[in-house]
């Protein structure tokens, strides 16, 4: 599965806009074909990605966009720190299961 993320610091892509923008095949294909930032903004609006005021998405993360291939069946989430997005896989995370009153040590 292809996912668009922006690794550069400053502004994320889907984490600063509509989360569905990370997975939209139309946006991914356009990016892979070399679309410009302005044309991507127009495409996002055509696809219905506008904020609550009807404004187009913020394109600050566009310059650092990349396509990441996620293996089929993988549990993942898009994380963001200071605008830099990254993929976190379930098995790479520290998850705890609540059982009983106290966690067994």
What kind of feature is each model-predicted range?
Residues 1-105:
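Catalytic phosphate/metal-binding cores of nucleic-acid and nucleotide-processing enzymes, i.e., regions
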């Amino acid at each position: 599965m292809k996912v668009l993320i922006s690794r550069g610091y400053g502004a994320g892509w889907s984490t600063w806009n509509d989360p569905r923008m990370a997975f939209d095949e139309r946006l991914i294909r356009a990016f892979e074909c070399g679309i410009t930032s302005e044309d991507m903004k127009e495409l996002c609006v055509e696809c219905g990605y506008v904020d609550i005021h009807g404004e187009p998405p913020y394109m600050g993360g566009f310059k650092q966009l990349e396509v990441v291939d996620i293996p089929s069946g993988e549990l993942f989430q898009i994380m963001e720190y200071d605008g830099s997005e990254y993929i976190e896989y379930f098995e790479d995370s520290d998850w705890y299961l609540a059982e009983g009153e106290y966690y067994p040590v």
